Amino acid sequence: YVQPSVGLMRFNFVLILLGVVGLIAATLIGRFGPGWYMLYPLPFMTTWAGWSIGVAVISVMLLGTAWLLGQLDLLRAIVGRYGLSGMLGWQYFRKGDPGEDLPPMVLIVAVSMIAGAATTIVGAVMLMLYLAQWLAPELQFDALLMKNAVFLFGHTLVNITMYCGIAVVYELLPT
């Protein structure tokens, strides 16, 4: 229905590849235990190699950057085709002819990308704080706040992935 930027998607592919390779290296070589989950303050335990903490955090930052850029580019493409009010289906609340039909897939993706972009920014702030603590171990943060940021970032990401996956299934089903 829309055309995202091919160049940006290729750049995102490289960022995602680097992020995944970094996480694999931190986990398998550096024995970084928390994996991608990284519930605070677990990443800063001294059970694994110190470098693996930084590699894991930077890797998830690369992944988050790629996801945020992709989300924003999809939103840009949808707004370019359907307009801001059109992508959210507001035309159906007005009297009269709504004009061009909004495919359900576009509405689902638009709403998912708005939620995803907002919570990916929360995840970016959280990861910058993780990076700051890795560079300056004397820093300490509120564990409950960090836990909530991890959950908001991670669970929203998983949910929008499910929503978009279900939208693809609906799109493929015969009408």
Model region roles, listed by residue range:
Residues 1-175:
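Hydrophobic alpha-helical transmembrane segments of multi-pass integral membrane proteins
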